[in-house]
């Protein structure tokens, strides 16, 4: 499915990846990019740029989609057990991790009532273009 040329291992939504005795479930969570994935391991999830601590990944470049991210967040991640720890790819806000319940309660981007409200909110963020994106974007596509 991925158009990335450097992918060494291709996997699919809900596929179990085995690393010795460690099992990690791949969860396709498009939105930040079409190929965004989160990885579930026991009581934790590595959320990359999909769900951050008190924020969500931006969707305004790299073929992102706020509508797809809404589905990834509200129909997948937020349905996980509340105690599950989340470890984002960056923007930790000086915390080592958060939990699904903490994000439901405290994340301002998760307080919306509908897909339309989320899409409008994400479209109105007016974020500045990140530094070094001319290097990072090609590496992520």
Predicted region positions:
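Accessory terminal helices/loops
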Residues: 71-141
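Catalytic core of the metallo-beta-lactamase
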Residues: 5-88
């Amino acid at each position: 499915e991925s158009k990335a040329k450097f992918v060494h291992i291709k996997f699919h939504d809900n596929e179990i990846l085995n690393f010795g005795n460690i099992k990690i479930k791949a969860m396709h969570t498009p939105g930040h990019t079409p190929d965004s994935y989160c990885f579930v391991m026991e009581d934790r999830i590595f959320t990359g740029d999909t769900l951050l601590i008190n924020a969500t990944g931006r969707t305004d470049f790299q073929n992102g989609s706020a509508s797809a991210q809404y589905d990834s967040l509200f129909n997948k991640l937020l349905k996980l057990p509340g105690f599950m720890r989340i470890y984002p790819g960056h923007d930790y806000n000086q915390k080592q991790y958060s939990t699904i319940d903490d994000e439901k309660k405290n994340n301002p981007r998760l307080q919306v009532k509908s897909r339309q409200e989320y899409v409008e909110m994400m479209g109105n963020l007016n974020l500045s273009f990140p530094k070094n994106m001319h290097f990072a974007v090609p590496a992520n596509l």
